[in-house]
């Protein structure tokens, strides 16, 4: 029954993407016959001789052929956390035909991302990222090797270094000032009614990242094409592919229109990048003075011959694709979750606002340098990232060779997920792990930059998020200004604050708040 439900859901999703509906009528019986044959064959199959000799980690019971796919549910990070409580912090599963390791503790996460990072630092090559990110020539999804090392070096030293983060300060300052102005206007027009704060945060975050990458504002894009297409790309990166889990059924992805749909999204971005690169090359030839953005920097690197390989235009596009996806989504997602938590915790809200306003003083505005003195704000941000890591299941890694982990045998080519959601809510490490308690960090120096494995919202090791400094700088500055310039409350007020805000999630590459965030702002006068 679980098998039929799974395929029915996937097939219906595929139907929405495919324009060949008449062909699909004939495809359904063929699909059913294929499933029946494969199901019958695998029921009688036994584990390989090699696997019988290995000491594999504990595994939940799995179904023939689909393995443990049916146990993932709508929120895999939550389902896998629940399973790990029964089967342990190192758990072996099968997602279709793919052997998969789930890591759910800080100790084992450290082993994967530090002690044996060189073994686990590659990426499995899957359908959607390969198509959408130029056949694995980006940074996030590229397999480990010389190409990845070179492009990551470009990213760390040229694009997202601390020096570059400071260079783009002007974009953050100008866009946050505009955000404050928009909130004031919306508040005045609403006359005490709630405003859609989430919508404003999305716009501001995307404006900052677009100005840094393109030299243009997000709002300059006609018909909101950029925002909608980026959102769809984010959704499809995590979409289901038959070929990824059942290699013999890869043809179904083509037949149901899935591959064509992914390529249509890729083509839209590819045309956009072509136009963007041509515009930047033309501007460089004119020689007019202007602020350099990330496209300019990449074109300079492409032309200076400093790399051990040719940085092609496709390589440049792949890196830009990473920047958009990683930069635009995580900042506003974190800000929305944090304001949601604060609105339900007025004591914490008051305490952090008092600190922000005390540090900024009578100057009448917040400077980025002030944030270093806002210790409690840092605690609040850490606690928010602990409860709501942008990607609760870190991007999958892949074992490049046979390896031991926690006393168990892990075969080469095993896919590895570190469940940051489970690690950061581990009751063995955190007191009252499901509660929002920023004070836990006042006497705890645990950081989120990948050195402390109890808190890994951005990963760690060679695969730590290279844009961490950029994203954190943007989020901190946005939040400090919102807390300085406005008092905030929930629309309905009342004593049962936790019941007035829907904290439901939407799962994807990053986990968003399902319902829009509406809050009531009251302007503050220094």
From Swiss-Prot:
PANTHER family: CYTOCHROME P450 71A2-LIKE, CYTOCHROME P450 FAMILY 71 PROTEIN. It is an enzyme of class 1 (oxidoreductase). Its cofactor is heme. Keywords: Heme, Iron, Membrane, Metal-binding, Monooxygenase, Oxidoreductase, Transmembrane, Transmembrane helix. Pfam families: p450. PROSITE patterns: CYTOCHROME_P450. It is a single-pass membrane protein. The chain crosses the membrane at residues 22-42. Expressed in seedlings and leaves. It comes from Prunus mume (Japanese apricot). InterPro entries: Cyt_P450 (IPR001128), Cyt_P450_CS (IPR017972), Cyt_P450_E_grp-I (IPR002401), Cyt_P450_sf (IPR036396). It is found in: Membrane. GO terms for molecular function: heme binding; iron ion binding; monooxygenase activity; oxidoreductase activity, acting on paired donors, with incorporation or reduction of molecular oxygen. It comes from the Eukaryota. Belongs to the cytochrome P450 family. It catalyses: (E)-phenylacetaldehyde oxime + reduced [NADPH--hemoprotein reductase] + O2 = (R)-mandelonitrile + oxidized [NADPH--hemoprotein reductase] + 2 H2O + H(+); phenylacetonitrile + reduced [NADPH--hemoprotein reductase] + O2 = (R)-mandelonitrile + oxidized [NADPH--hemoprotein reductase] + H2O + H(+). Its EC number is 1.14.14.44, 1.14.14.77. Heme binds at residue 465. Involved in L-phenylalanine-derived cyanogenic glycoside biosynthesis, including prunasin and amygdalin defensive agents. Catalyzes the conversion of phenylacetaldoxime (PAOx) and phenylacetonitrile (PAN) into mandelonitrile (MAN). To a lower extent, can convert various aromatic aldoximes and nitriles; mediates the transformation of 4-hydroxyphenylacetaldoxime, 4-hydroxyphenylacetonitrile, indole-3-acetal-doxime and indole-3-acetonitrile into the corresponding hydroxynitriles, but cannot use the aliphatic compounds 2-methylpropanaloxime and 2-methylpropanenitrile as substrates. Its main location: membrane. One of its GO terms (cellular component) is membrane. This is Phenylacetaldehyde oxime monooxygenase CYP71AN24.
